[in-house]
Amino acid sequence: MLRPALVSALALSLALAGCSKTDASAPGEPTRIADTGSSQAASATGEAAVLPAAATSVREVGAPESSLVEMYLKLHQAPELSFKEARTSALLAQELQSLGFEVTTGIGQQWVTDKAMKDIGEVKPGVGGYGVVGVLRNGNGPTVLIRTDMDALPVPEQTGVSYASTVESQTWTGVDSPVMHACGHDVHMTSWLGTARALVAQKSKWKGTLVMIAQPAEEIGLGAQAMLADGLYERFPKPDYNLALHVSADAPSGTVVYSPGYAMANVDSVDIHVKGKGGHGAYPQATRDPILIGAHIVTALQSLVSRNVDPLDSAVVTVGSFKAGAKHNIIPDEAVLLLTVRSYDDDTRQMLLDGITRIAKAEAAAFDAPEPEITIEPDYTPSTYNDPAATTRVIKAIGKKLGTEYVREVNPVMGGEDFSQYARTEDKIPSVLFWVGAVDPAKYAKAKADGMPLPSLHSSLFAPDYERTIQTGIDAMSTAAIELFKD
């Protein structure tokens, strides 16, 4: 999943670069860093929170177990695309079984089969529902679910590392592509396994039921739906809390960043098929030009955010594709606009979708053209909402474990993540997702000092500082789980 930059240039990076004081936050970067024990203070008053003293050194992080390093390298070199995670899921299931979990595989199989038949009319070889659920019971207490995603991306790796992926495969819809773990899911899985090991080793510190799930197809926003539709909450212990982490490509390894409340956005895809009447470019009066109509739609759509969304709320309406015509002197019969729509609040989301429909139809009518065909993709990714109370508990515990100077609050982002689905059932289960910094601290400091961008998630150049990131993920997630088991 694509994530915008999460963290501003911390004093840590400036210290490493030889600077003695911090710069003001750049536009789009975090404007506040709240104390881990009072994450809601700033948002409640609308005032910026007081910045705590920043770290002046790189956090010391112990090396992960050598078997976990080997696991990471194995996963990175053998990435699998969405709904094709057969070997990956089998490996994770085997690891959970060795730890004493009750393990069930193939979660979501029927849903995936039905989806493939509906969308492309067939089930391609190797496509399936590869969800894994592991259950470990440890006396009476809360049930805590910890999720990892498994799928890689159709991206050619260009990192130059010795363990780079050279895998080529087909997407679940049949498109040939190179494959790379360009979004850190290999780190997620390794930290997830390390967390399972840590919690098994520390069973004396918690009571309850631990549910570890490995989810397919996060990158296409469908894996959580598949697992929930296959009875995740009915066939297995229903969680009292859900936890997940994600790497950050713009935070130094050894750190954790988080956003209470809305953390990530609703993600909708909308297609607008503009219908006109084609003809010769020299005689436009005899046509209904869909390119002109489409251009008016693109311009008018911008008023939705600027004049319909509360300035204190956030929303994005982006036209990512405008396709029409094939020759200089031919006015085509149609044009197609492809939109991505981002929001946090459900009411704002609905207002945007209604507004897109209204504007597209009105602009077509103004040109006396046929009504456009508007398709809103039903399988959207809902916004990720971090339960404030659970987030406060989790972050306070992580701050004690890592050191509060290495745990930072950041602004929510407009990226999407289908972990949100687990909190969207009628049970409204409190859920928390936090980010783990994945950039080598020295590289992070140099990039910030030089004003140079870092390789982003989904980039063919993204190569995380994997050992420090994996261990920080283990430390943070196992601490979070033990805290929530205290209920």
Region locations from a protein language model:
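Bacterial N-terminal signal peptides that target proteins for export
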Residues: 1-8
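Histidine/acidic-residue-rich, glycine-tolerant segments that coordinate divalent metal ions
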Residues: 131, 170-180, 186-187, 199-318, ...
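Metal-dependent amide/peptide-bond hydrolase catalytic core
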Residues: 51, 295-487
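Bacterial signal peptide processing site
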Residues: 19-22
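Bacterial N-terminal signal peptides
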Residues: 8-17
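Post-signal peptide N-terminal segment of mature Sec-exported envelope proteins
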Residues: 26-56
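Acidic/His- and Gly-rich active-site-bordering loop/insert found
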Residues: 48-181, 190-194, 198-207
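Divalent metal-coordination and catalytic microenvironments
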Residues: 68, 75, 96, 134, ...
